[in-house]
Amino acid sequence: MILVDTSVWIDFLEGKGSPQHHKLRMLIENDEDVCLTGIVVTEILQGIRDERQNREIRDYLLEFPIFNPQGMSSYIRAAEIYRTCAGKGKTIRKTIDCLIAAVAIENGLVLFHNDRDFVNIQACCGLKTFSL
């Protein structure tokens, strides 16, 4: 199953025509197993000011499977990811990316992203990813 990060969803929803936008559209059209985490839903919806558009996008996103942190162990794993990367000289800009990575690792998901934090996490912590 492919966990799609906020960076890719935003390109897709804004119709930017990026390689990530086209790949996600292809995955969805081919009924591939695409999923989100609640954190990604939050990041997407917080930036949509128009109420009607917010509701439409929310309803669309909620059609996909949602994976969430598995309790305190996910938050501890996120901290471990951050510390491991820092110990290897890799800077993680957003702590939330460590939590998204923890959810992906715990659930055996492959993360589709366009965010350098995940490149660093993959190098340090065995996160399975693909990006374009």
Sequence positions of predicted segments:
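Acidic, PIN/NYN-like endoribonuclease modules and their adjacent C-terminal/linker elements
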Residues: M1, A101, I105-L132
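Short, well-structured N-terminal submotif of metal-dependent ribonuclease cores
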Residues: M1-L36, Q46-D59
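Short beta-strand scaffold positions
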Residues: V4, L36, P69, F112-H113
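Generic structural signal for small/hydrophobic residues in well-ordered secondary structure
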Residues: D5-T6, I44, A78, A104
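A generic structural signal for short hydrophobic patches within well-formed alpha-helices
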Residues: W9-I10, V41-I44, F118
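A general structural signal for well-ordered alpha-helical segments in protein cores
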Residues: H21, V41, N54, Y75-A79, ...
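Short, hinge-like loop/turn segments at secondary-structure boundaries
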Residues: E51-R55, C85-A86, K128-L132
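Active-site neighborhoods of divalent-metal-dependent phosphate/nucleic-acid chemistry enzymes
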Residues: I66-F112
